[in-house]
């Protein structure tokens, strides 16, 4: 535990179709440092086309991969992705942040089929000088509730508590931005080929 209770390490977990990957990042220095990595293959039929076919096997592999890095925490950062996640950038009337949640639910109903079966989140985006005083740009994210709940069950069975659940594309972007901040001023293309 760091000063004032801030943790010095973060454990990141990526569950791919063929591999479970765990990374331990130390935040005690001026820049984050990758200190441990473990990669464990999954059986061929454990995850097929992004759908978990055998949750018990997947949770066992996750548990073993976490143990391989000897992480002294069971709190991890995980992500969801694939065709069951919808990301939309929308323009809407400018409102105060506390009113935004209700407005985003209404906006989601316009963009997401069966809004009652998804988990919603949003981020109000900062505009560089071109923003209208009456409008705001918002990134709206919807993930199928079944997908999120299935991921949480697998993590729970593995004895893991997610500190946060991100979208895999955002996690890739954030990792790039932290490691290559100067590249963010130009055009950048990131490709997640996966395995």
Segment roles from a protein language model:
Residues 1-107, 149-152, 157-161, 186:
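Non-catalytic, solvent-exposed interaction/assembly segments
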Residues 1-5, 112-113, 180-182, 191:
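Short, solvent-exposed secondary-structure boundary motifs
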Residues 177, 186-187:
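Glycine-rich, charged/polar anion/phosphate-binding loops
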Residues 188-195:
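Acidic, glycine-rich loop-and-beta core segments that form the ion-binding/anion-interacting portion
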């Amino acid at each position: 535990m760091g000063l004032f209770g801030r943790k010095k390490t973060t454990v990141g977990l990526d569950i791919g179709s063929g591999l479970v990957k765990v990374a331990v990042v130390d935040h005690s220095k001026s820049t984050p440092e990758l200190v441990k990595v473990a990669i464990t293959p999954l059986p061929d039929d454990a995850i097929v086309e992004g759908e978990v076919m055998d949750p018990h096997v997947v949770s066992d592999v996750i548990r073993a991969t976490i143990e391989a890095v000897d992480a002294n925490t069971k709190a991890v950062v995980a992500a969801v992705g694939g065709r069951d996640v919808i990301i939309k950038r929308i323009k809407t009337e400018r409102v105060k942040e506390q009113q935004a949640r209700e407005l985003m639910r209404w906006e989601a109903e316009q963009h997401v089929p069966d809004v009652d079966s998804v988990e919603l989140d949003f981020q109000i985006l900062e505009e560089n000088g071109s923003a209208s005083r009456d409008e705001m740009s918002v990134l709206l994210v919807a993930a199928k509730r079944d997908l999120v709940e299935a991921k949480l069950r697998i993590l729970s069975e593995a004895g893991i508590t997610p500190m946060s659940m991100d979208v895999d594309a955002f996690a890739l972007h954030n990792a790039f931005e932290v490691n290559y901040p100067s590249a963010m001023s130009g055009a950048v293309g990131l490709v997640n080929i996966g395995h």
